[in-house]
Amino acid sequence: MVDVAFVCLGNICRSPMAEAIMRQRLIDRNISGVNVYSKGTGKWNLGEPPHEGTQDILNRHNIPFDGMISELFESSDDFDYIIAMDQSNVDNIQNINPNIKGKLFKLLEFSNMEESDVPDPYYTNNFEGVYEMVQSSCDNLIDFIVKDANLKEG
């Protein structure tokens, strides 16, 4: 099994959106052997469900997110791929675990966009724009993981 974690600050907007989208895309593409998680580097929202804006956008696109609650990224976490939403999250992850073993990337490294960071819709309220960024990056990320981890599609 391959473990993938999406990480943002509070784990209520961007990373749970990415977790839900990634899970759905893996199902759509009939790819098994991948566990998908989301975590936050801040403690403010622990145990809370995704933000209402994240829930709304996922519901509009018929992407399930049942049972998701905010969890903290911890030094003991062991993931094969850690996908941060922005440079601040990369820095926080490296501070939490300086000896991180998993492969650490920013999500937009897998996009064709000029931006390098996914903006936090908690502050911008642009959940649709963030959805588009995440959705457009997930298939390229899946392609990378399938090749890198020698997984089979279909």
UniProtKB/Swiss-Prot annotation:
Catalytic residues, chain numbering: C8, R14, D120
Catalytic activity: O-phospho-L-tyrosyl-[protein] + H2O = L-tyrosyl-[protein] + phosphate
EC number: 3.1.3.48
Keywords (A to Z) from UniProt: Hydrolase, Protein phosphatase
InterPro entries xref list: LMW_PTPase, Ptyr_pPase, Ptyr_pPase_sf, Tyr_phospatase_low_mol_wt
Claim: Transmembrane is one of the keywords in the record: no
Domain of life: Bacteria
Gene Ontology molecular functions: protein tyrosine phosphatase activity
SMART domains recorded: LMWPc (SM00226)
Function: Dephosphorylates the phosphotyrosine-containing proteins.
Membership in a protein family: Belongs to the low molecular weight phosphotyrosine protein phosphatase family.
UniProt-recorded name of the protein: Low molecular weight protein-tyrosine-phosphatase PtpA
Name of encoding gene: ptpA
